[in-house]
A protein has these predicted regions:
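Alpha-helical elements of Rossmann-like donor-binding domains used by nucleotide-donor carbohydrate transfer enzymes
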Residues: 11, 15, 30, 50-53
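Arginine residue identity/basic-tract feature
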Residues: 11-13, 23, 32, 59, ...
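Conserved SAM-binding loop and adjacent beta-strand
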Residues: 21-23, 36-50, 56
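N-terminal start-of-chain detector that recognizes signal peptides
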Residues: 14-15, 35-37, 89
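S-adenosylmethionine/decaboxylated-SAM
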Residues: 45, 49-122
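Short, basic/glycine-rich phosphate-binding loops at helix/coil junctions
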Residues: 28-34
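N-terminal auxiliary segments of SAM/dcSAM-dependent transferases
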Residues: 1-25
Length: 122
């Protein structure tokens, strides 16, 4: 690949990310903002959308997320469970797991999905 190919690939990925970000719900934007305020880095919008798509395609009823304060992914996976099932969030930081619980509590009026939050310090 030459320099032009790399530049075109970067532009394509930028377009995909911007498109995924523009489609985020208010709950996702709020989760991203809360995480930023706490200093928890989040994955890309496209990555979270891909997880949502995969969970829907597999008709998942139970999913596990492992990471440090992966709030955006949690919101996407709760949506992918269509208000049912169980989400297990394993987090290495106490701050991340506390924020996950708080965020999930805010969603509890709109979903029957259950949360199992586990703090696993490294």
């Amino acid at each position: 690949m030459d320099k032009t190919s790399y530049a075109n690939l970067a532009r394509a990925w930028e377009y995909v990310e911007n498109h995924a970000y523009s489609r985020q719900t208010q709950a996702l934007l709020d989760a991203r903002e809360q995480a930023a305020q706490c200093g928890l880095a989040q994955g890309s919008a496209a990555q979270a959308q891909l997880l949502h798509t995969l969970a829907c395609m597999m008709r998942s009823t139970s999913v596990i997320t492992i990471g440090s304060g992966s709030l955006v992914e949690i919101v996407q996976l709760v949506d992918a469970l269509h208000g049912t099932g169980q989400l297990t969030a394993v987090d290495s930081s106490t701050q991340g797991i506390a924020l996950s619980r708080k965020m999930f509590f805010a969603l509890s009026d709109t979903t029957q999905t259950t949360l199992r939050a586990v703090n696993a310090p490294v």
